[in-house]
Regions:
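Bacterial carbohydrate/catabolite-sensing allosteric modules
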Residues: 33-40, 60-65, 80-182
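Histidine-centered beta-alpha loop that forms part of the nucleotide-sugar donor binding/catalytic region
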Residues: 47, 74, 100-103
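Flexible, active-site-proximal loop/turn residues at the rims of small-molecule/cofactor binding pockets
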Residues: 18, 75, 140
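N-terminal helix-turn-helix/winged-helix DNA-binding helices
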Residues: 1-29, 37-38, 48-49, 60-63
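Short, Asp-centered acidic motifs that coordinate Mg2+ and/or phosphate
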Residues: 67-69
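Conserved ATP-dependent adenylate/AMP-binding module captured primarily in the ANL superfamily
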Residues: 52-56
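Short aromatic/hydrophobic contact patches that present stacked aromatics
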Residues: 13, 43, 110
Length: 182
């Protein structure tokens, strides 16, 4: 049993929430390229934003199939603030690295973009160019990254004494809702 537990598979499990999002496709491509260069194989799974599927995939692959996980948290897990499945896997000795959509409550390594500063700096750049009516369109308002981006945008307006115009701010939880509002 101990021999199996310490066995290295040279395989990484990657769980992404949505393959149709070009960001996740690019991230996966980068992970696969570096893993291949380092002699690792990659198993990619898609949670389809489902907490149940995310949990099942973690449990299925953590039985010795992989050495660790790279994960972007599903929409459902973020909405429900349910991250116990990650902690259980980590407590069993399988390491997890979260990227993009993370859970602060989970003790693991994380790779993130500073969404707040990125939105603040982008909005400030437009203001510096002389733009006055800067719109915000977000179809991920229910996710941590969407909330942080909106906060950065609003902070840039505040810093520059630009009044918030709610007529040009469209924040929804899905692209379909956003398209309907536009």
């Amino acid at each position: 049993g101990l021999n199996l537990k310490n066995r290295k598979t040279k395989t990484i499990g990657v769980i992404i929430p949505n393959i149709l999002n070009s960001f996740f496709a690019k991230v996966f491509s980068g992970i696969e390229k570096i893993a291949d260069e380092k002699g690792y194989n990659v198993i990619m799974c898609i949670s389809n934003e489902s907490l149940e599927k995310e949990t099942h995939t973690l449990e299925m692959l953590s039985n010795g199939t992989i050495d660790g996980f790279i994960v972007s948290v599903s929409e459902e897990a973020q909405k429900n603030h349910d991250y116990t499945h990650f902690s259980a896997i980590i407590n069993d000795g399988t390491p997890i690295v979260m990227f993009d959509r993370i859970a602060d409550e989970v003790e693991c390594d994380k790779v993130i973009v500073d969404d707040y500063d990125s939105a603040l700096n982008s909005t400030q750049h437009l203001i510096n160019l002389g733009c006055k009516n800067i719109a915000l369109f977000s179809s991920i308002d229910n996710l941590s990254v969407g909330k942080l981006r909106a906060q950065g945008y609003l902070q840039a307006l505040k810093i520059n004494d630009i009044p918030v115009n709610n007529d040009i701010i469209l924040r929804t939880d899905s692209e379909d809702d956003l398209n309907d509002k536009i």
